[in-house]
C-alpha cells in the first residue's frame, strides 16, 4: 500500500462521521415532526370536543327557551279565557237584571192600570185582582226560571272553562315531563359521547407516546450500532496508523543503514586513493 493510497482511504473513512451526524440530525427532526403531529392531533380532538359541547349547550338552551315560550303562551291564553269568562258572566247577569226590571216595570204598569180599572169597575174588582195576582205569579215564575237557566248556563260555562284549564295544565305537565325525559336522555348521551371521546383521545395519545418511545428506542439502538461501527473504524484507523508508522520507521532505518554503508564505502575509497 502506497502512502497516497493510505491517505485517500483515511480521508474517505474520516468523512463517515459527518454522514452519521447528518443522519442523526435527520432522525431528530423526524422525531420532532412526529411529536408536533401528535400534539396537533391532541389539540384537534380537544377542540372538536369543546365545539360539540358548545353545540349541545346551545340545543339545550333552545329547548328551555321553547318551554318558557310555551309556558308564557299558556298563561296568556288562560288570562284571556278568564277575562272572557268574567265578561260573559257580567253580560248574562246584566241581561237578566235588565229583563227582570223590564218585566217588573211592565207588571207594575199593568198592576197600576188594573188597579185603576178596578177602581173604575168596583163590581169586577175582586176577579180582576185575582187575575192580576195570577199573572204576577206566572211572570215571577217565568223570571225565576229564566234566571235559574241563565245561572245554570253560567255555571256550566265556568265548569267547562275550569275543565279545559285542568286539561291544559295536564297537557302542559305531560309536555314538561316529556321534555325533562328528553333532556335527561340528551344529557346522558352527551356525557356518554364526551367520555368516549375523551377515552379515544387518551388512547390515541397513549398509542402515539408508545410509538414515539419505540422510535426513540430504535433510534438509540441505531445510534449505538453506528457508535460501535465508528469505534471499530477508529480502531482500524489507529491500527493502520501504527502499521504505517512502523513501516515508515523501517524504511527510515533502512535508508539510514544504506546511507551509513555508502558513507563508509566512500570513506574507504577516499583512504585508498
From Swiss-Prot:
Keywords: Coiled coil, Cytoplasm, Cytoskeleton, Microtubule. InterPro entries: Giardin_beta-like, SF_assemblin/giardin_b. It is found in: Cytoplasm, Cytoskeleton. Residues 20-273 are annotated as: Rod. Residues 1-19 are annotated as: Nonhelical region. Residues 123-175, 211-263 form a coiled coil. One of its GO terms (cellular component) is cytoplasm. Shows an alpha-helical coiled coil structure (35 repeating heptads) related to the alpha-type fibrous proteins (K-M-E-F class). Interacts with BOP1 (via C-terminal WD repeats). Giardins are involved in parasite attachment to the intestinal mucosa and in the cytoskeletal disassembly and reassembly that marks the transition from infectious trophozoite to transmissible cyst. They may interact with other cytoskeletal proteins such as microtubules in the microribbons or crossbridges, to maintain the integrity of the ventral disk. This is Giardin subunit beta.
Amino acid at each position: 500500500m502506497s502512502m497516497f493510497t493510505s491517505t485517500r482511504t483515511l480521508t474517505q473513512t474520516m468523512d463517515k462521521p459527518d454522514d452519521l451526524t447528518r443522519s442523526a440530525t435527520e432522525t431528530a427532526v423526524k422525531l420532532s415532526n412526529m411529536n408536533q403531529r401528535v400534539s396537533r392531533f391532541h389539540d384537534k380532538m380537544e377542540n372538536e370536543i369543546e365545539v360539540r359541547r358548545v353545540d349541545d349547550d346551545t340545543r339545550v338552551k333552545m329547548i328551555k327557551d321553547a318551554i318558557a315560550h310555551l309556558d308564557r303562551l299558556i298563561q296568556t291564553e288562560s288570562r284571556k279565557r278568564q277575562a272572557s269568562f268574567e265578561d260573559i258572566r257580567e253580560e248574562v247577569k246584566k241581561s237578566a237584571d235588565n229583563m227582570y226590571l223590564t218585566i217588573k216595570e211592565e207588571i207594575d204598569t199593568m198592576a197600576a192600570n188594573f188597579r185603576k180599572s178596578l177602581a173604575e169597575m168596583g163590581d169586577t174588582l175582586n176577579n180582576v185582582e185575582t187575575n192580576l195576582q195570577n199573572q204576577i205569579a206566572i211572570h215571577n215564575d217565568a223570571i225565576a226560571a229564566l234566571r235559574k237557566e241563565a245561572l245554570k248556563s253560567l255555571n256550566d260555562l265556568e265548569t267547562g272553562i275550569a275543565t279545559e284549564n285542568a286539561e291544559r295544565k295536564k297537557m302542559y305537565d305531560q309536555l314538561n315531563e316529556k321534555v325533562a325525559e328528553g333532556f335527561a336522555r340528551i344529557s346522558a348521551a352527551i356525557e356518554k359521547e364526551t367520555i368516549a371521546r375523551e377515552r379515544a383521545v387518551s388512547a390515541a395519545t397513549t398509542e402515539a407516546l408508545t410509538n414515539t418511545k419505540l422510535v426513540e428506542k430504535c433510534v438509540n439502538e441505531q445510534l449505538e450500532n453506528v457508535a460501535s461501527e465508528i469505534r471499530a473504524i477508529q480502531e482500524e484507523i489507529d491500527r493502520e496508523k501504527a502499521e504505517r508508522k512502523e513501516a515508515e520507521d523501517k524504511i527510515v532505518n533502512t535508508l539510514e543503514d544504506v546511507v551509513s554503508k555508502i558513507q563508509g564505502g566512500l570513506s574507504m575509497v577516499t583512504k585508498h586513493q
